[in-house]
């Protein structure tokens, strides 16, 4: 059985964002996959397609 749960790392502890139902003493394997910046910031800014294209072009050109 595979379960995917978002978590946050704070003060040396990995905290799950939702509870999971596992039996006491159950051993698990954890695979850490950091969220991409695009996933963390999705929906925060309202940008037009033109603005997004300009930002991407600026990044690709090294900020020029």
UniProtKB/Swiss-Prot annotation:
Entry keyword set: Toxin-antitoxin system
Tagged with keyword Transmembrane: no
Entry-linked Pfam families: AF2212-like
Domain of life according to the entry: Archaea
Coiled-coil regions listed in the entry: none
Record family assignment: Belongs to the UPF0165 family.
Described purpose of this protein according to its UniProt entry: Possibly the antitoxin component of a type II toxin-antitoxin (TA) system. Its cognate toxin is VapC2 (Potential).
Stated name of the protein: Putative antitoxin MJ0975
